[in-house]
Regions:
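Acidic/histidine-rich alpha-helical segments that form the ligand environment
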Residues: 24, 28-29, 38, 42-98
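Conserved alpha-helical segments that form or flank metal/cofactor-binding pockets of metalloenzymes
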Residues: 7-42, 113
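Amphipathic alpha-helical coiled-coil segments
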Residues: 18-19, 70, 77, 103, ...
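Short, contiguous alpha-helical
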Residues: 25, 94-119
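Short, small-residue-biased leader/transition segments that mark boundaries at the very start
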Residues: 1-3
Length: 119
């Protein structure tokens, strides 16, 4: 079983990687297309395909839900990659490819945690 300190550090690393490496860049790429990002938390939630948690789940369920959300994110990124390539937006496609690599890594790490918890 993974210690809570190890999981806390792991989740913190994912949080830092996602928020440090994607949020601002995503917004900047959206602006290069003369579009605007959602301007409020409510609008962001309306558009989101990933739902937040209202309770604090046990560690295993937390990992399972994060893995499912990560898979959703990979599917969305694949759709975005295809759209960027179809519109000949190579810079955006490259950025999305980097995000896909990062989420693939998150996925195998989450699966590894789940496998280790079965032992």
């Amino acid at each position: 079983m993974c210690s809570s300190d190890l999981l806390h550090e792991f989740f913190g690393n994912i949080y830092e990687e996602v928020y440090s490496n994607s949020i601002d860049k995503t917004a900047e790429y959206i602006r290069t297309l003369d579009e605007y990002t959602p301007g409020s938390f409510e609008r962001y939630n309306e558009l989101s395909q990933i739902q937040g948690q209202t309770k604090i789940p046990r560690a295993r369920l937390m990992i399972e839900e994060l893995l499912a959300d990560n898979t959703t994110m990979i599917n969305l990124l694949n759709d975005c990659f295809d759209a960027a390539e179809a519109e000949d937006q190579q810079g955006i496609a490259n950025f999305i490819a980097e995000r896909l690599d990062a989420h693939a890594k998150h996925g195998w790490m989450l699966k590894s945690f789940l496998k280790d918890q079965r032992a």
